[in-house]
Amino acid sequence: MEASGKLICRQRQVLFSFLLLGLSLAGAAEPRSYSVVEETEGSSFVTNLAKDLGLEQREFSRRGVRVVSRGNKLHLQLNQETADLLLNEKLDREDLCGHTEPCVLRFQVLLESPFEFFQAELQVIDINDHSPVFLDKQMLVKVSESSPPGTTFPLKNAEDLDVGQNNIENYIISPNSYFRVLTRKRSDGRKYPELVLDKALDREEEAELRLTLTALDGGSPPRSGTAQVYIEVLDVNDNAPEFEQPFYRVQISEDSPVGFLVVKVSATDVDTGVNGEISYSLFQASEEIGKTFKINPLTGEIELKKQLDFEKLQSYEVNIEARDAGTFSGKCTVLIQVIDVNDHAPEVTMSAFTSPIPENAPETVVALFSVSDLDSGENGKISCSIQEDLPFLLKSAENFYTLLTERPLDRESRAEYNITITVTDLGTPMLITQLNMTVLIADVNDNAPAFTQTSYTLFVRENNSPALHIRSVSATDRDSGTNAQVTYSLLPPQDPHLPLTSLVSINADNGHLFALRSLDYEALQGFQFRVGASDHGSPALSSEALVRVVVLDANDNSPFVLYPLQNGSAPCTELVPRAAEPGYLVTKVVAVDGDSGQNAWLSYQLLKATELGLFGVWAHNGEVRTARLLSERDAAKHRLVVLVKDNGEPPRSATATLHVLLVDGFSQPYLPLPEAAPTQAQADLLTVYLVVALASVSSLFLFSVLLFVAVRLCRRSRAASVGRCLVPEGPLPGHLVDMSGTRTLSQSYQYEVCLAGGSGTNEFKFLKPIIPNFPPQCPGKEIQGNSTFPNNFGFNIQ
């Protein structure tokens, strides 16, 4: 983090310096000049930049001094430890500058923190390492014997790659009686020899001469080169060819093709015959001119031999000689000026590039580069740009550009940028250079983990195995690297009584949730808790989600018959009058199931009966009713076995055994009472017995029911304090009745004993239930506030 901060600080200093670069350049001093002799070995000392810049060595190292030169060739190297500026390689002045004098290599010195910019130049001093060389080692000069003394004959000059005093200084010729040599200077500064006739020739005495021409340079010691001059003495030819004009000036575009006609020169000779025939040739042509141009010896047409390059040479001075068949010749000069065309694309030199860059740091310097164009004029003017839809901008100072961020970036929206730097010149047609770079964005922890859901509902079937993987929660972080590594944890529950750490656990790495122990629906129907997700950033960011766990009931409880009691005591006998109509309610089997949902949906069916077809059981409520009219032939005692079955998978069941006694003279509740019969002592005694028996049975039944209800309520109260109750949604099937563990008797019945006074006939009257069914309570927040479930059993006996 500390290194990153220093980098950002340094980049901002560079940016600030570039903003002031224009002002600093306006007041900049003259370029600093240094010199070095050519052919000096590489790594040779040039200067100490720290002393030149007035900097201490520590300050020099801190400011990150760099040496930048135009183009991609760097002839100098900087020792950062000693601040010595050294030669990068051995320099050859002739290769670098040719005949240009002085030979100056320009470079720039860049300083950071704050940014400063100095122009400097290195002058390469020539040494005399080249001797004069004649391109033609043998020259033929034809001299008419009629030539008077003082006649001059130009000779082909020698070439010396050195410059200044190391170039050709003068020419000398071997001793003879007729000629001497003069050293002449052309307009471009080059020197050439001219042969001067001192004494008239006589062909009859001497037909030819062989002389040695020597070219000397001004070096110390001087170097020399020689050529042989053959002088042929001719008979009289008294007229030399003359050009139409002594000087030609032409312009030619540098992109002219090979074979292009540059110009046509023309000369005439007043002589006739062979002496009037003229041939043209290049005179005193340098090696470069000889490679570039050719002349038709018959027509005088000058054509291109190779492509021109304005950036290398802007003009050529070509001497043309017109020679007749005799000894005379004429000369003219053709100045060929090369016109620049836009044939060089701009060049981009990258000095510094930074990637990745932090996403939250505006005005960060990304790249520092320079641009150049070898063309001239409008062809060398340059414009630089990048794509408009990018959050970056360019700032320029002379030919240097800085690429920096325009505003804070968002790595989560875009993790990298492909930037194309387009450099265009103003020539026609315009030439374009493009530099592509990819800038990566470094992540900053600015995004908290986000769960895929704000809440999760998990369904776990009771009696699960411990350490069961029940589900996974997942959170993602838009950051990257350690900033996107998510750790999961359980947050403290809002309910302090909830033993969360003993119920579930979470894998911190992948968010897998595990049930630590087996759950019991009858003890805990559901619970909720919060999970947290935090990243590894600095500072760390986090988020949370709600997890609801719903315990699904399993069919692990069989139906329990509340009535009639099945405790092995004396069986309860139901009395049914023989006069009962079909559908007469004999009794009702009441049962409950500790499970819930469809596991608590109960159905009833008659499993066994003493006489089939006499009684029936309603499947949805357990009511036992007569199926037909009773007759005297029907047995008085009947034993019924009722099967109570839940709707679980697999289903569980229980049975209830009923004893039914058919009696005479016992009426239904709404049947008209029979007329009073004569009092009989025996009938009265029987009535008393029946009343006592019925009262005893009813009292015992009521006491058993109350005791059972009290025990169930006590157990339910303890269970309700641990968890919540869940009630299944949807209607019950038509053949089932919901008897979940939170229910007891759904109805209460009244039993009324009616005695027919004086008749001696005893009848029981069964009344309809007077307590309505209560809908099941759906525990939620109300049950959490009250730990006692509304399970009550009520009976009224008259």
UniProtKB/Swiss-Prot annotation:
Residues 712-798 are cytoplasmic. The chain crosses the membrane at residues 691-711. Residues 1-28 form the signal peptide. Residues 36-134, 139-243, 248-348, 353-451, 456-561, 568-671 form the Cadherin domain. GO terms for biological process: calcium-dependent cell-cell adhesion via plasma membrane cell adhesion molecules; cell adhesion; chemical synaptic transmission; homophilic cell adhesion via plasma membrane adhesion molecules; synapse assembly. GO terms for cellular component: membrane; photoreceptor connecting cilium; photoreceptor disc membrane; plasma membrane; postsynaptic membrane. Keywords: Calcium, Cell adhesion, Cell membrane, Glycoprotein, Membrane, Repeat, Signal, Transmembrane, Transmembrane helix. It is a single-pass type I membrane protein. It comes from the Eukaryota. InterPro entries: Cadherin-like_dom (IPR002126), Cadherin-like_sf (IPR015919), Cadherin_C (IPR032455), Cadherin_CS (IPR020894), Cadherin_N (IPR013164), Protocadherin/Cadherin-CA (IPR050174). Its main location: membrane. Glycans are attached at residues 418, 436, 567. GO terms for molecular function: calcium ion binding. It is found in: Cell membrane. Residues 29-690 are extracellular. PANTHER family: CADHERIN-87A, PROTOCADHERIN BETA-13. Potential calcium-dependent cell-adhesion protein. May be involved in the establishment and maintenance of specific neuronal connections in the brain. This is Protocadherin beta-13.
